[in-house]
Amino acid sequence: MPFRFGTQPRRFPVEGGDSSIELESGLSSSASCNGKETSPNRQLRRCPGSHCLTITDVPITVYATMRKPPAQSSKEMRPK
């Protein structure tokens, strides 16, 4: 059986920013091949292997506030 585009299932789930037209046709556009994809709501960037999506242009303070402070042990909480 000859190989045809679009006959193999996607290896990874559809993510925000993926084009349903591209998925149906099985053809890749230059936008998806250059490592950047755009969405009306946010900028998305794919890693070179198309394994992950990264939201670009997010201030570092957002990441800093998302981190949880390290859990304190009971020894640190008791005053000496």
UniProtKB/Swiss-Prot annotation:
Coiled coil: none annotated. Pfam families: UPF0731. InterPro entries: FAM229. Residues 33-42 have a biased composition (Polar residues). Residues 1-45 are annotated as: Disordered. Residues 15-32 have a biased composition (Low complexity). It comes from the Eukaryota. Belongs to the FAM229 family. This is Protein FAM229B. It comes from Rattus norvegicus.
